[in-house]
Amino acid sequence: MNATRAEYPLASLYIGDLHPDVTEAMLYEKFSPAGPIMSIRVCRDIATRRSLGYAYINFQQPADAERALDTMNFEVIKGRPIRIMWSQRDPGLRKSGVGNVFIKNLDDSIDNKALYDTFSAFGDILSCKVVCDEYGSRGYGFVHFETQEAANRAIQTMNGMLLNDRKVFVGHFKSRRERELEYGAKVMEFTNVYIKNFGEDMDDKRLKEIFSAFGNTLSVKVMMDNSGRSRGFGFVNYGNHEEAQKAVTEMNGKEVNGRMVYVGRAQKRIERQGELKRKFEQIKQERINRYQGVNLYVKNLDDGIDDDRLRKEFSPYGTITSTKVMTEGGHSKGFGFVCFSSPEEATKAVTEMNGRIVSTKPLYVALAQRKEERKAILTNQYMQRLATMRAMPGPLLGSFQQPANYFLPTMPQPSNRAFYSPNPVAPVRPAPQWASHQSRPPQYQPPAPLMRAVPPRRMHSNISTMKQASTQVPRVPLQSQRVANIGTQTAGARAQVNASIMRAMPHYKYSCGVRNVQPIGSSAHLQQVLEPAVLMQGQEPLTASLLAAAPLQEQKQILGERIYPLIHEMHPTLAGKITGMLLEIDNSELLHMLESPESLHSKVEEAVAVLQAHQAKESAPKSAPQSLI
């Protein structure tokens, strides 16, 4: 094994066939007796974090890795024998096929260890595996030798030998492409013919009489069920290809026993499955191409909208070939599909109908996507959101961050210090106070934005000293300092709120040389200490990346807190209802409305018109109809 050790100087081992519950700690406990370990990594799915069933272990010394490979291979961890081999970073060595041997017709009792023990006599083995499924061994496996000479010796010695009373085939490994090329050449010279759809009144003798007219038949077989009746298909094997081809040409489509029979080349199951799969994919692709760019997905439908109403709403934009509202138990599921005759008509419908309010609900209209495409897009969005959250700076003083409803005095800072928010989104947000079915009480005000403490500009003392000092500062709850209408204050009013809070606070200063903080007497100095530490989180600019960093269940809530005050300025009595209606629109369009007052005003007026029409419809029977506004 010296040559092997020189070839893999990093002493890295691949551990395969692991149980999904095996962790790095279990592997360390198992392999640490072999020698000092530098690192262990169980490979996991990037999205679900589930184990992929293999791991890598890096030893400090190649001799320790070699010892683990020799003594621990095929040992059982959590009921499964593990498989150990040298880690090969170069995929060319694995895919070249040099030294790789294929064995088939194995007995079910032969596992990885038995195969390894049998073939290790011919040379050093890089990897050894018996292919299994949920039912056990599939009867074949692979042995990858370190050299081609060892592989040749194994083939010469073991091919045709009995292994557990079964004659095994041992040969050079061939890639799937090589096998398909060889099989394709043999297919053109077929001699075996498949016949189906001749009914139950057929046996071997009669089938032979029919097909012996085309040549010498070596074998004829009608497939039977357990009761001895024909299953309606069978096989005829001819002596040469010309006779078989003549039988196919003459008999395919002819009537036998009053039935039109199919006669063709006999195929292996895997070949037939592959052909059916190709046909299915072809039909699927044709369907995708036919509906590409013309099929629309419509969601947020009112429960009263059916297929006819959906067609009526979209018919002004072009010729509709089909409409369908998806239902379950006779009730609408809230979404459906509209298919146009051309992509131009579909694009126009998306432009005009997306966001339009139909029966008190704004529609979401977009090009329909296949499940695979939608899943890929959602996965990509999730990964981008995850990367954005990881890229954002973490809390500088996170080890002793105060509760959200407490104010923490901080160290003196220059007045021009930029605001630093430890977390881009508030950790706790109150539940939404609006609903689409009822207006908000006139006296309601949006929740007060949380106040954050700004970390110091320089930190010369160690963290433990700062933590001890911070625990000595009394916490003054903001509950006693609440100010009415804090969500709609002007900049001057916010400054007065800050000043009133600071006047109520005890005076402290921070000293890195002592454990206890001391009060100071200068109120002017207090103003310099505390003013940069308070900022309304609700005034932070809301961007797409900041919104994406928030949990999905909080994103609508964040948008609602931003959009409600703007709607309240236009229609105070209907702000709650309008906010609830607009929040059903896509987040990207809501962000656009926050940036564009004209777009927001247009949507608000459209919602008001719908509400007025709805009330007028309800109050029509009354003698004195009343307006909403």
Swiss-Prot record:
The keyword RNA-binding applies. One of its GO terms (biological process) is chordate embryonic development. Keywords: Cytoplasm, mRNA processing, Protein biosynthesis, Repeat, RNA-binding. Residues 11-89, 99-175, 191-268, 294-370 form the RRM domain. It is found in: Cytoplasm. GO terms for molecular function: eukaryotic initiation factor 4G binding; mRNA 3'-UTR binding; poly(A) binding; poly(U) RNA binding. InterPro entries: Nucleotide-bd_a/b_plait_sf, PABP-dom, PABP_1234, PABP_HYD_C, PABP_RRM1, RBD_domain_sf, RRM2_I_PABPs, RRM_dom. The keyword Repeat applies. Belongs to the polyadenylate-binding protein type-1 family. Interacts with dazl in an RNA-independent manner. The C-terminus can self-associate and also interact with the C-terminus of pabpc1, independently of RNA. RRM 1 and RRM 2 interact with both eif4g1 and paip1, and the C-terminus also interacts with paip1. Prior to oocyte maturation, found in a complex with dazl and pum2 proteins and spdy1 mRNA; pum2 dissociates from the complex during maturation. Interacts with the translation termination factor sup35/erf3. PANTHER family: RNA BINDING PROTEIN. Binds and protects the poly(A) tail of mRNA with or without an AU-rich element (ARE) and prevents mRNA deadenylation. Stimulates the translation of mRNAs to which it is bound during early development. This is Embryonic polyadenylate-binding protein B. It comes from Xenopus laevis.
